[in-house]
């Protein structure tokens, strides 16, 4: 094939065109294009693609003036508009759109590429031409989700102004992701102000479960202040935020939860309350925190176990001594028991220590002998022993009070 004017074969003409483009000799470019019968070829597209990547606005306009089909796509399905967005060239993108470049409103690659550059003008331009701001990618994530991941406060606010939907979720909601770290607190506050569901459970957990597990104290408090349910349970397992805080040894999170109404005796699906976890961890801090705030140690799970089973199995002298002392204090103070059988089971468990390690047992209950309390307190729960204990305590107040002070019991909370 020859051109009209030059009488040259097409390959030679294409070569001359490429050289003229490289030299940015736009006069020659126009002359060659004028003489070519068909400029909507892959070779011409490739020339223009390079022009877009090199931000050559003049060449783009020349091709458009010569009626080049700007909606041609290459072998991977990319149009010139897609390349303009990829190189973040708003001017070329506008030229193409004004010239009739077609936008697939559900082309997530186009929008998400613009989001990568965080260019508000480009996103504004795409929205003006009908892009779906809430289109999901093949993983189910939207532009807003990726912007949140980048912790870009201004861009999040911008997308929300463009009606980005905060309720779209995949495996985790946007609020679940924000709950993973304190650094997202500003963006979290924006979404909460927009009314995102603070108690949404996606997959297994609610946002407060995630915040507590990650020891995100600020996020935990922010969620609570926006009416997050501190006692909401996992979809599978039935654990509450307090269960999780203790499991992860996040003391401050546990303290915040309890101070904001967390149920210290909430059961999971197998009947374990938070104190079961504290006992299994052999952590006296959590044992004391829970018991000081009214947790019941005389409780059994579906396997018939009490927290004391775990205390003794763990073998921590400090935790065992604290637990023994606490159980004895319940009897001394004549606390009303919710599950007398569980209490009896606990006392029998402790009494067995005497058979396995008498010396250790004597260390645990040495203070009890100092009170001159009857030994039967460990094994016999007849009412007559209550009167004996109360009588002994009243005659040995000077010894009893220092003991209580040593373990810092707060029995008004226990009741």
Swiss-Prot record:
ANK repeat copies, ranges: 12-41, 43-72, 76-105, 107-135, 139-168, 170-200, 203-232, 237-266, 270-299, 303-332
PROSITE patterns in the record: ANK_REP_REGION (PS50297), ANK_REPEAT (PS50088)
Assigned keywords, A-Z: ANK repeat, Repeat
Keyword flag Protease: no
Family annotation (Pfam families): Ank_2 (PF12796)
Protein name per its UniProtKB record: Putative ankyrin repeat protein FPV034
Organism of this sequence: Fowlpox virus (strain NVSL) (FPV)
Gene from which this protein is expressed: ANK2
